[in-house]
């Protein structure tokens, strides 16, 4: 259902801090033309933490509208209170999305049983496919493979975005989860190896600015042409790493603006513009990747 090169899309803003829907449409068209397989709207990279609930729902709905059915849109969701996560899912149910990407509850550090009950409650409220999202580096909680396996038995929990960077988990998840459960990397630097080990794709930050290369690389990998895919990945590796030289999405927004993909690279506080010392480092990575 979900595979290949999926972009964790940035949310562009105007200089006065409003969502820039003109740039958003431009981004959607850019990804359609580049062969991106799906878009995650308002996930971590889309600055979900600094959008109001109303803005979040509108950005997702407008992204679906701009896509015009040309590629599926996945809505970023999640909260550290289960009732809020359920409410969020209800609000997004009628926007035309193809799925939810639901991050584990953050800060309050639930147990594995708490994680299971949290996602089970979300799944009971919708028929739309749910993608689990494990990113312990941001949430301070790690969803263990055993918990993922339990959740994979729930009908509409269909996939996992694994942003741990731990490649040993691919085999564990493949062995423990039900047949057909989709594994997606959430780590650009290890994404190709993740697919080589049995994953089905990557939800990518790099894809925001190197969409055609990421699509080609993932499609080659899924066809078993790993040597050709590795050649592209090697060219992008410095970019994969340097897009995290400061907190994401700070570097990728700066790069997208530099490339003319968005009207400006503003973020909402507490996120700030890319620092002056980091700018030549990201610029050099763009040059090495041969995309700007």
Curated annotation (Swiss-Prot):
One of its GO terms (molecular function) is 4-hydroxy-tetrahydrodipicolinate synthase activity. The keyword Glycoprotein does not apply. The keyword Cell membrane does not apply. It catalyses: L-aspartate 4-semialdehyde + pyruvate = (2S,4S)-4-hydroxy-2,3,4,5-tetrahydrodipicolinate + H2O + H(+). CDD domains: DHDPS. Pathway: Amino-acid biosynthesis; L-lysine biosynthesis via DAP pathway; (S)-tetrahydrodipicolinate from L-aspartate: step 3/4. It holds the Pfam family DHDPS. It is found in: Cytoplasm. GO terms for cellular component: cytosol. Its EC number is 4.3.3.7. One of its GO terms (biological process) is lysine biosynthetic process via diaminopimelate. It is an enzyme of class 4 (lyase). InterPro entries: Aldolase_TIM (IPR013785), DapA (IPR005263), DapA-like (IPR002220), Schiff_base-form_aldolases_AS (IPR020625), Schiff_base-form_aldolases_CS (IPR020624). Keywords: Amino-acid biosynthesis, Cytoplasm, Diaminopimelate biosynthesis, Lyase, Lysine biosynthesis, Schiff base. It comes from the Bacteria. Pyruvate binds at residues 45, 203. The active site is at 133 (proton donor/acceptor), 161 (schiff-base intermediate with substrate). The record marks 44, 107 as: Part of a proton relay during catalysis. HAMAP family: DapA (MF_00418). Homotetramer; dimer of dimers. Catalyzes the condensation of (S)-aspartate-beta-semialdehyde [(S)-ASA] and pyruvate to 4-hydroxy-tetrahydrodipicolinate (HTPA). Belongs to the DapA family. This is 4-hydroxy-tetrahydrodipicolinate synthase. It comes from Vibrio cholerae serotype O1 (strain ATCC 39541 / Classical Ogawa 395 / O395). The gene is dapA.
